[in-house]
């Protein structure tokens, strides 16, 4: 079967060969399941890396190449007795038992462990002598350590069940393990809650069980195929494990929405009397084309994150682009095939009470609810534009107090063993054993000049309360030196970042002065700080890329420079309001208790840019669907006011339902334990809600009324632009009565 690359012809060809299309998608689904089972875990990583070379990466690369090999995870096990000191025989017996069990895991899990009774108590015993530490270096790289640390945690859990003492573990691997476990749990919870609420909303919007299940099925198919492709691509490029959350969240949101728009138009055309094939053609030529172009806008917005030289941004962008692409493809091929096969069976298992409500409250008819909204708003367009803009600008104001950073271990739930361990380590020791600052000297590291500079730096650091004990080592030929300094703060918090800035900008220059050596500062906090700086540096480029390409695409689609300009301004208003509300709730704590969120001092540093990319694309969805319906009517009547009212009333219920589905999906993820998911889900949900309510129902019709025919203004100098209108062909007027059931041609 030969298909044209035209989305309309693609859908038409799929509807005329439905079983072939369903068969192809079934094979892809099964293959994806196999790829997920065999390859996905190996395609994911708990670490983030840069694709350029900031200070922290340059230092880490030197250490890996010339001193210690691949970076390893350093853990700390803390044993604490309330009534015994480390020199008590009972304390030593318990300490040795735990040490020996950990050592017995073997070199495949534990690279090394230090016993205080062999190495001496210095740095391994608390000041009150009631707590003692077992420093552990995990075997393998950070990903292997995050997997193997579960065996150590099992030992700790078993020992912690005993009475009379407490035992804790913390460190990069333990923190990563807890984070990944919580992420997987939050993912399952978000999918369950979001999926169930989405099903209820679909039932309310569509009124039948079969039609409500179709969007869910296509969303699941899109998610599975995206995960399968991630597993395959991950053999050459490792993805952040958070990409699975991204794919599920975006897949449920756009997969359901895209199917809902096309399926609803199909049912509408069947109700007008078109045959099944004609209804598929019209739905694909109108709603299907809208799905394509709105999906392309989403992809363009997500592509902005690919500019940033960070693997986590590239991972999230790639995962989201994959699932959006499969959702578009499913809407243009699999859905038309299913609509052809189901025909009017898509309306089976009606829910009579919902149908009765829809019949009695048909808001899509002339004079219905949405018609009244449009009429009222367009009577006072200036008031509508000014009032909504003022509200959104006011909601944006808290954003100017934003403090970006990383949530850190301190924001983990209290039940997380890595948090308990970190707090105990911080209370009883310096706290920096597992995440020290590392100063790397690239030159003759054994020379008197370098040795003097190192001693001078140690003296400077001793005056800063954040920094603790320092140790210095060099490689065999003395070409690389490493000064490792403990930090007595949570390595993710702003206080730690400021300490690294002082180290880089003040302390190192003071100590090394004219010493002929390259000095780099690396370590967990330095990597985190560089990530923040890289994000800040590249944000303007991402904004320019997304806004510029979105403007061009919308200008081509609607053949207007006014429509894309307005759409961009409105989207920026909704994104700005979302930013402000995140700061208000998460950072300032307004309503946090009611929503079940944790108040923190910072908003995740990557969140504003991430939200901009995702929200800009998603917000365009509703603009594209609404404006395409308005343009479709305007081309027929030439009456701007009538076209706006028509567009609003024919998309009102649909867009409201679609938006509520997105809010439900994002809200499900916001109910997780991790602060980053709370902030992400809340920000996405509130922005979509704002966009689909006051912007779509008040700001869009008000501005359309004010500008009138100028909405569709295209300068004559641009008249050469190709016509790729989103409205498509409706195939002429529909017959008065519906034709036969499931077949049609």
Cite the ranges covered by each PLM segment.
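Structured non-transmembrane domains adjacent to transmembrane bundles in polytopic membrane proteins
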Residues: 53-72, 82-173, 401-592, 624, ...
């Amino acid at each position: 079967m030969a298909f044209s690359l035209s989305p309309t012809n693609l859908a038409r060809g799929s509807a005329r060969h439905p079983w072939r299309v369903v068969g192809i998608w079934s094979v892809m689904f099964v293959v994806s399941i196999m790829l997920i089972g065999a390859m996905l875990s190996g395609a994911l990583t708990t670490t983030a890396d840069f694709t350029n070379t900031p200070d922290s990466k340059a230092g880490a690369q030197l250490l890996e190449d010339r001193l210690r090999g691949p970076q390893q995870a350093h853990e700390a096990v803390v044993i604490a007795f309330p009534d015994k000191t480390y020199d008590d025989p009972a304390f030593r017996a318990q300490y040795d038992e735990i040490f020996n069990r950990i050592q017995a895991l073997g070199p495949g899990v534990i690279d090394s462990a230090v016993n205080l009774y062999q190495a001496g108590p210095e740095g391994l015993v608390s000041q009150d002598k009631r707590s003692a530490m077992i420093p552990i270096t995990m075997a393998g790289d950070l990903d292997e350590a995050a997997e193997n640390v579960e065996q150590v945690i099992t030992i700790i859990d078993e020992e912690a069940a005993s009475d009379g003492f407490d035992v804790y573990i913390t460190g990069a691997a333990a923190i990563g393990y807890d984070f990944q476990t919580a992420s997987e749990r939050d993912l399952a919870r978000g999918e369950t809650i979001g999926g169930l609420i989405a099903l209820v909303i679909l039932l309310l919007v569509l009124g039948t069980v079969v039609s409500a299940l179709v969007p869910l099925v296509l969303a699941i198919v899109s998610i599975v195929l995206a995960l399968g492709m991630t597993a395959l691509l991950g053999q050459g490029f490792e993805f952040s494990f958070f990409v699975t959350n991204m794919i599920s969240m975006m897949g449920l949101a756009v997969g359901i929405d895209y199917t809902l728009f096309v399926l609803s138009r199909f049912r509408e055309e069947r109700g007008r009397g078109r045959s099944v094939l004609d209804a598929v053609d019209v739905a694909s030529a109108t709603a299907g084309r809208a799905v394509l172009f709105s999906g392309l806008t989403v992809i363009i917005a997500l592509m902005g994150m690919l500019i940033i030289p960070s693997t986590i941004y590239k991972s999230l962008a790639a995962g989201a682009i994959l699932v959006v692409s499969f959702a578009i493809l499913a809407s243009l091929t699999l859905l038309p095939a299913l609509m052809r096969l189901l025909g009017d069976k898509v309306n089976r298992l009606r829910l009579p009470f919902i149908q009765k409500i829809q019949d009695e409250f048909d808001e899509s008819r002339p004079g219905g609810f949405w018609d009244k909204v449009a009429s009222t708003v367009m009577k006072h367009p200036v008031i509508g534009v000014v009032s909504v803009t003022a509200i959104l600008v006011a909601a944006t104001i808290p954003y100017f107090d934003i403090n970006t950073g990383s949530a850190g271990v301190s924001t983990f739930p209290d039940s997380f063993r890595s948090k308990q361990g970190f707090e105990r380590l911080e209370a009883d020791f310096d706290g920096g054993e597992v995440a020290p600052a590392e100063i790397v000297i690239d030159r003759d590291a054994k020379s008197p000049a370098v040795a003097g500079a190192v001693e001078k730096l140690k003296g400077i650091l001793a005056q800063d309360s954040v920094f603790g004990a320092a140790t210095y080592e060099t490689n065999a030929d003395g070409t690389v030196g490493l000064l490792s300094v403990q930090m007595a703060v949570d390595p993710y918090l702003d206080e730690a970042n400021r300490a690294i800035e002082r180290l880089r900008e003040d302390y190192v220059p003071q100590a090394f002065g004219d010493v002929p050596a390259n000095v780099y500062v690396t370590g967990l906090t330095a990597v985190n700080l560089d990530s923040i700086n890289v994000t800040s540096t590249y944000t303007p480029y991402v904004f320019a890329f997304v806004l510029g390409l979105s403007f061009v695409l919308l200008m081509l689609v609607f053949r207007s420079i006014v429509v894309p300009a307005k759409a961009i301004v409105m989207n920026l208003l909704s994104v700005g309001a979302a930013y402000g509300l995140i700061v208000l709730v998460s950072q300032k704590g307004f309503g946090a208790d009611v929503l079940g969120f944790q108040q923190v001092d910072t908003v995740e540093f990557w969140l504003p840019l991430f939200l901009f990319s995702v929200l800009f694309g998603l917000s365009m969805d509703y603009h594209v669907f609404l404006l395409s319906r308005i343009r479709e009517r305007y081309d027929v009547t030439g009456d701007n006011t009538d076209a706006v009212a028509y567009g609003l009333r024919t998309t009102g219920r649909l867009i409201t339902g679609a938006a509520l589905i997105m809010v439900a999906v994002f809200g499900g993820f916001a109910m997780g334990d991790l602060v980053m998911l709370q902030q992400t889900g809340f920000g996405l949900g509130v922005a979509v809600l704002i966009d689909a309510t006051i912007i779509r129902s008040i700001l869009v019709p008000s501005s359309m009324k004010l500008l009138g025919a100028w909405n569709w203004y295209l300068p004559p100098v641009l008249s050469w632009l190709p016509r790729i209108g989103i409205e498509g062909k409706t195939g002429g007027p529909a017959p008065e009565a519906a034709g036969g059931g499931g077949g049609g041609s």
